[in-house]
A protein has these predicted regions:
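Short Gly/Pro-enriched turn/cap motifs at secondary-structure boundaries
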Residues: 37-40, 64-67, 79-82, 108-115
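Long, acidic (Asp/Glu-rich), low-complexity accessory segments flanking structured domains
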Residues: 122-140
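Helix-loop "lid/cap" segments that line or gate small-molecule binding pockets
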Residues: 1-9
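Alpha-helical interface subdomain recognition
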Residues: 9-14, 21-26, 39-42, 51-56, ...
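Conserved hydrophobic/aromatic beta-strand scaffold that supports enzyme active sites
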Residues: 30, 46-48, 73-77, 90-92, ...
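Flexible, small-/acidic-enriched active-site or ligand-binding loops
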Residues: 44, 98-127
Length: 288
């Protein structure tokens, strides 16, 4: 998502300076939008960038930042103007910049392989050249980037759900109870049938939304919101059902499903909660 917004909205100098190392995975980026007091209401952010002779002096903090304290570059949404969305800009903060610091590594339910921390700015000096696009257009860029991010999260959910389904299906054929494999009990058959159907429907819906976004269709954003909401909800349901099929074994680390359940749960919150997805969808359909 960070690479996309630099590629799409950054000038040539920013692209040449940062993109090569990002796309080669030599450098890691963090997308800094959420703040302690502004999650779903992202436009209420308070991190402020005051104009200086060199560029900007950044003050504030960002919360729940994936890669916080680990990343090489931070894409930061900050307020350079009034209190409306038009007063928000996007800047790039390089790791090691004076005034940049981090909170403790958060202890999370899932996503344990990825560091998450508060990112703090205390008179952090940013060169004017690190402004992405135009001043005051940052919120627009952030929302554009979130469309792609929502598809990414949905795709990750789908992959996790597919794996959980495969584990459960295989287990149901091997595990016997009352003299026969549990896969031959109608209750398990119905669960597996529903899981397979949900996976196929979610996959097709996700591909449709991705195609609309790639082709700049007018309903792309609402289709992305629909896909993110549906796929992440369905994927968590599938993984949770898979755990139930394994019974007590599903609760053990050894079988891998408990990790999928823990990891997929946050996908219903990331990149805009699924409640916010419903708000986006409702506003679109009611405006027709």
């Amino acid at each position: 998502m960070s690479a996309w917004v630099i590629s799409k909205r950054g000038d040539q100098a920013l692209k040449e300076k940062f993109l090569k190392n990002i796309v080669s995975f030599d450098d890691v980026c963090s997308y800094c939008l959420t703040e302690p007091g502004s999650g779903s209401d992202a436009a209420a952010l308070k991190t402020k960038a005051a104009i200086t002779n060199e560029g900007y002096s950044l003050n504030g903090s960002k919360s729940f930042i994936s890669g916080g304290g680990f990343s090489d570059l931070y894409v930061v949404l900050c307020r350079t103007g009034d209190q409306t969305p038009n007063g928000i800009s996007m800047v790039l903060v390089e790791n090691g910049q004076k005034g940049l610091s981090f909170g403790k590594k958060e202890q999370k339910m899932g996503w344990k392989a990825q560091p998450t921390a508060i990112v703090q700015f205390d008179n952090c000096s940013i060169p004017a050249a690190n402004l992405v696009g135009e001043e005051g257009d940052g919120f627009k860029y952030a929302m554009e980037g979130l469309d792609g991010g929502r598809l990414n999260i949905a795709a990750a959910s789908l992959g996790g759900a597919q794996k959980a389904y495969e584990i459960a299906k295989s287990y149901s054929k091997e595990r016997s109870a009352f003299g026969k494999p549990i896969s031959r009990f109608q209750s398990i058959e119905f669960k597996l049938a529903d899981m397979a159907t949900q996976l196929e429907a979610a996959r097709l819906f996700l591909r449709s939304a991705a195609w609309k976004l790639d082709n700049s269709k007018p309903d792309a954003t609402v289709s992305v919101a629909m896909a993110k909401r549906l796929v992440t909800d369905v994927s968590f349901e599938i993984s949770n059902t898979a755990l139930q099929i394994l019974g007590g074994y599903g609760y053990l680390e050894e079988y891998g499903i408990e990790k999928i359940v823990r990891d997929l749960r946050v996908h219903q919150i990331l990149e805009g909660t699924n409640e916010i997805m419903r708000v986006i969808i409702a506003r679109a359909i009611l405006s027709e």
